[in-house]
Amino acid sequence: LPKILEVRDRVPEVMRIKEGANYILMELGPRRETFIEYTVECPLRGFYSLGPVTVRIQDAFGLFHKEKELHVYNDFLVFPKMEDLKETFVKSRVPKIFTGAVNIRQPGPGSEFYSLREYFEGDSFRAINWSAYARSGKLMVNERERDAVSDIIIIVDSRAVAETGPVSRNALVYSTRAAASLAKYFLGRRDSVGVIVYGDEVVSVDRDTGKKQLYVILTKLAGAVARGNIPLQVVVNRILPHINKGSPIIFLSNLEDDPTIVNALRDFRARDFDVTVLSPSSLEFEFDAKRLDRTGYEVMKTERDVLIGELRGLGVNIMDWEPDMLLSTALAGARGF
C-alpha cells in the first residue's frame, strides 16, 4: 500500500500566510520531488526564522504514522514599513529647510557667486552679468559655487518606554517606520543620512549616501529593541562634536521619562541646528487600547502639552503625532504647513 508523506514548514506566529500553504501532502515514491510555495505577511519588523520542518509518514488509512523534526531553518529580515513621501512633499517648503547645503568650491548649481566666464550658446540669459558686458563689450555669465548634498541626522528613541502600548501600535513602531521613510526619501534626493538609535546603548550609522546606505539603515532599524533608559543629553553630548554645522536634526521620540530632553534640545538650538521632533504619543496608544482611564489620560496629556509648548519656545519644530496621522501630515504640521 502507498504511504502518505506530509511536510510542514513552521511559520512564526506573528506572520500570516497570504498565499499558498506551508505544508504539502504527497504519496511517497522513489525519486519524487515537490516544492512548497507560499507567501507570508509580517506586520512587525525584526529578525525571523522559518523552520524547523516537520515530516510525517503515515499509511493510506491514516492509522499509523512516524514523525520527525528536521532542523532546517531559513533566516530573514523584515524591514520597517515605509511611507512614500510624494512629489507634492518635495515641492512644499519643508524640504528646502532640510537642504543644509554647503559649498565645495566647484562651479555648478548653487546660490553663491564663483566666477565670471564668457557666454556660450545655451547659457541662460538670467546668468548674464550685464555690468561686465557694459565694461568689456563681451557677454559674460555668472558661475555659481556648487552646493554639496545635505547631512541629515535622524535620532530614534529606543528606550524601554518607547514600547508602551500594543505591540503593533507604539512609539517605537511609528518611530522606526518614520526613520526608514525619511532615510529613503532623503537618500533618494542624494542627501547624506546618518542615524542614531539609543536605548540601553547608543548605536549609530555614520553618514553616507546611496542605496547601500539605505540597506544599512533599514537593517539597524529592523533590529531596534526597546530597552534601557539612556538620557537624550548623553546622546547629544556624544554626537555634537561630530555633526556638521547646519545639519538638520530629526528626533523621533514619545518624549517620556527623560528630564534631560529640554536641555538636550536646547543645546542643539543654541548652536543654531534646525531641529524637528515627531512625537508619537504613548498616551494615545494606551487610551485607544483602553489601558488608560479618562482622568489619567487628561492629567498626562496636560503635562505633555506643557512640554511640547516649552520645546516650541526654544524654536524646535515639533508635532504631537496622532496614531492615525500620516507621516507626511505630521512632518508638515511640525514645520508649520
Enumerate the language-model features and the residues they cover.
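Von Willebrand factor
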Residues: 209-247
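Short, flexible loop segments at the rims of nucleotide/cofactor-binding pockets, characterized by
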Residues: 131, 225-229, 253
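Residue-level detector of flexible, active-site-proximal loop/helix-junction positions
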Residues: 137, 159, 202, 228, ...
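Von Willebrand factor type A / integrin I
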Residues: 89, 243-249, 255-337
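An amphipathic, basic-hydrophobic helix/alpha-beta surface used to engage anionic
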Residues: 1-208, 248-251, 258-259, 264-267
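Conserved phosphate-coordination/catalytic loops
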Residues: 173, 226-233, 298-302
